[in-house]
């Protein structure tokens, strides 16, 4: 597993005190099972300014991610465990959140789902807890106007990396609904803009927020600034699910004019965090770090 339960001190020590020589690890790593594009992205990252910006905590995580990728059989999805542990995860129960979430529909829920559905990546106890949280989230969003967009959502990404339930003849996941609520907030904040949005997302994980926005917004320009291997996976996912979009990487660009040219010519652009400085001021209507 990527993470075994540890004490708070052990977690802190591993993340912040122990030296994590990611450069040395990458140099010595047997890369024969890694995708060629991921190797190229990682080589550029190790030599970039973004590497210097990366915390010990994330260097520790990235080392674990590469170890997991090379040890995962070709028949399995290498991203699944990483997405669940570090790029997303699942929400479980705490008393305050449950009370606040249930205020509007207490005693009104009619169960029409398999609440005891066991998910492969979760224990039965965690599966039931997850299912209850998902049901509560659904009850909070199903009557909102934003939920009318359900049929437009590209759902394959969420179903691939999140446990799902079928409720009212709709297949839902936690991160599908969470991303839809995030999209609702973005629409509220940008309702005065009467043209396609330019969006920058810092740290997109496997691409869940981008997937929602690209599903529901026409002609949006989207830039993702992230570290490998996450940026490789989000690019792969969005390329698969939005084949008609112009998608490019700009990891090797060092010139502002060249970066702005790539920005104007593509719908989705992938960069390292330090390259944000290569975009002109006011290039973006929305900046996200979720």
Region spans (language model):
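N-terminal accessory regions of S-adenosyl-L-methionine
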Residues: 1-172
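Conserved alpha-helix/loop element of class I SAM-dependent methyltransferases that forms part
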Residues: 176-196
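Conserved class I S-adenosyl-L-methionine
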Residues: 194-205
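Conserved SAM-binding loop of SAM-dependent methyltransferases across substrates and taxa
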Residues: 206-218
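S-adenosyl-L-methionine
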Residues: 237-280
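Hydrophobic beta-strand segment of the Class I
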Residues: 287-288
């Amino acid at each position: 597993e990527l993470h075994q339960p540890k004490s708070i001190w052990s977690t802190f020590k591993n993340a912040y005190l122990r030296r994590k020589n990611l450069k040395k690890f990458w140099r010595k790593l047997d890369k024969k099972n890694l995708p060629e594009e991921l190797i190229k992205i990682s080589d550029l990252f190790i030599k970039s300014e973004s590497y210097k910006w990366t915390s010990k905590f994330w260097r520790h995580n990235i080392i674990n991610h590469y170890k997991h990728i090379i040890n995962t059989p070709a028949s399995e999805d290498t991203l699944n465990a990483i997405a669940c542990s570090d790029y997303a995860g699942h929400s479980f129960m705490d008393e305050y959140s449950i009370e606040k979430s249930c205020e509007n529909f207490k005693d009104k829920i009619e169960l029409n789902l398999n609440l005891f559905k066991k998910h492969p990546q979760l224990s039965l106890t965690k599966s039931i807890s997850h299912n209850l949280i998902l049901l509560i989230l659904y009850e909070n969003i199903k009557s909102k106007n934003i939920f009318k967009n359900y049929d437009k959502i590209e759902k394959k990404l969420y179903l691939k990396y999140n446990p799902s339930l079928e409720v009212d003849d709709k297949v839902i996941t936690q991160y599908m609904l969470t991303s839809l609520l995030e999209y609702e907030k973005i629409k509220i904040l940008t309702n005065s803009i009467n043209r396609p949005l330019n969006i920058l997302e810092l740290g997109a994980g496997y691409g869940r927020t981008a997937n929602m926005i690209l599903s529901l917004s026409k002609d949006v320009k989207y830039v993702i600034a992230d570290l490998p291997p996450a940026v490789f996976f989000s690019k792969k996912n969005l390329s698969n699910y939005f084949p008609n979009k112009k998608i490019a990487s700009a990891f090797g660009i060092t010139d502002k004019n060249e970066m702005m040219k790539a920005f104007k010519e593509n719908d989705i652009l992938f960069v390292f965090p330090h390259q944000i400085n290569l975009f002109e001021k006011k290039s973006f209507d929305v900046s996200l770090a979720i």
